[in-house]
């Protein structure tokens, strides 16, 4: 059995990112993880978010490094175990760096977040839990729907491109990922002002939104406890990542899941098991189509029956008239014969 386990490679998936320090410490963490497996075969696969979601629906890896929004959904619906959260260097609490800071141009007259509803807002194309989804969480917590508040969203490939669009007046505001404002060059920062900046005890950076765990390591329920402990021991005691942060005890993902549920996030739709209500809702159009066809057939049937009755009545009426004419003819013929006979008798008597 252990030989079979050794021959079967341990699958490690990681979410690929293009911005921020996670593009360095997540692949390095995956290297450390497979290094702890000894002579066990392994396979590391890297996917961007759409690919990862698609693959996870059909293939459950042993370990996965991902943003905590996907982590919360995997924990909830695929029963993955949340092993560790990544505590960023600028964070003072386990994994609590996933927030967003909304910035506006220095000369903008926008006073608060509510005024941004429906305006043109920039976001990073790559940002998930940090940045975009925390901003969505903030708007939905205030009673807005995602569709109404973020009606005119524009995606940018990097912060610089987005900030330049903001300064040029192409967009009204920009959603920055947690701590990205502090990393901007001073020249750029001087042309901006944070909207509703808040200071949280968990981080040394400003934020507009609540903070959530950022990166998570999760293990499949089929991974043996012994292997989980080996991986935990390796990553928690590793100092090689200290430039970026460290892996710590898992921060709860309940609030992340609640945010996704509240804002009707598409991840919920991707992984939530279907209920009878969902199936009925999905079937509403085909069912309506079938009912309309049946109703059409019923109406057609009624019209055909009505037409048949009408035609039958016309035929009956025609026959009745024909019989009446025939009867008249018979009477006339009878009268004619009697008249002729009478004439003949009278003629004979003469």
Where are the predicted features?
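Extracytoplasmic small-molecule ligand-binding "clamshell" domains
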Residues: 4-74, 231
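Conserved HAMP-HisKA connector
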Residues: 321-350
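Pocket-lining segment of extracytoplasmic ligand-binding domains
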Residues: 120-223
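Acidic, polar ligand-binding/catalytic clefts
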Residues: 51-115, 136
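Residues at a fixed heptad register within alpha-helical coiled-coils and interdomain linker helices
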Residues: 299-302, 306-309, 313-316, 320-323, ...
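N-terminal membrane insertion elements
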Residues: 229, 233, 237-312
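Extended ligand-binding regions for polar small-molecule ligands
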Residues: 27-37, 107, 191-264
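Bilobed "Venus flytrap"/periplasmic-binding protein-like clamshell domains
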Residues: 7-36, 95-163, 179
């Amino acid at each position: 059995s252990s030989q079979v386990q050794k021959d079967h490679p341990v699958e490690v998936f990681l979410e690929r990112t293009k911005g921020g320090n996670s593009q360095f410490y997540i692949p390095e963490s995956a290297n450390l993880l497979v290094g702890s497996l000894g002579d066990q075969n392994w396979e590391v696969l890297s996917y961007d978010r759409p690919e990862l979601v698609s693959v996870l629906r059909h293939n459950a890896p042993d370990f996965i490094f991902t943003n905590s929004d996907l982590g919360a959904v995997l924990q909830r619906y695929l029963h993955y175990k949340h092993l560790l959260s990544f505590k960023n260097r600028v964070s003072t609490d386990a994994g609590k760096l996933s927030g967003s800071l909304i910035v506006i141009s220095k000369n903008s007259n926008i006073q608060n977040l509510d005024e941004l509803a429906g305006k043109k807002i920039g976001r990073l194309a790559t940002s998930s839990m940090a940045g975009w989804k925390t901003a969505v969480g903030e708007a939905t917590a205030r009673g807005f729907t995602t569709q109404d508040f973020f009606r005119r969203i524009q995606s940018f490939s990097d912060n610089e491109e987005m900030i330049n669009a903001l300064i040029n007046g192409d967009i009204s505001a920009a959603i920055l990922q947690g701590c990205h404002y502090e990393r901007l060059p001073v020249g750029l920062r001087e042309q901006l002002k944070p909207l509703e900046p808040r200071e949280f005890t968990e981080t040394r950076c400003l934020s507009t939104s609540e903070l959530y765990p950022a990166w998570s390591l999760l293990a499949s329920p089929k991974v043996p406890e012994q292997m989980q402990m080996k991986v935990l021991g390796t990553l928690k005691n590793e100092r090689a990542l200290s430039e970026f942060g460290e892996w710590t005890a898992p921060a709860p993902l309940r609030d992340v899941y609640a945010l996704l549920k509240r804002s009707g996030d598409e991840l919920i739709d991707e992984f939530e098991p279907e209920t009878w209500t969902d199936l009925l809702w999905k079937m509403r159009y085909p069912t309506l189509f079938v009912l309309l066809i049946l109703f059409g057939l019923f109406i057609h049937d009624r019209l055909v029956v009505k037409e048949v009755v009408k035609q039958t009545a016309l035929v009956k009426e025609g026959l009745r008239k024909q019989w009446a004419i025939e009867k008249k003819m018979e009477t006339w013929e009878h009268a004619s014969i009697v008249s002729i006979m009478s004439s003949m008798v009278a003629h004979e008597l003469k």
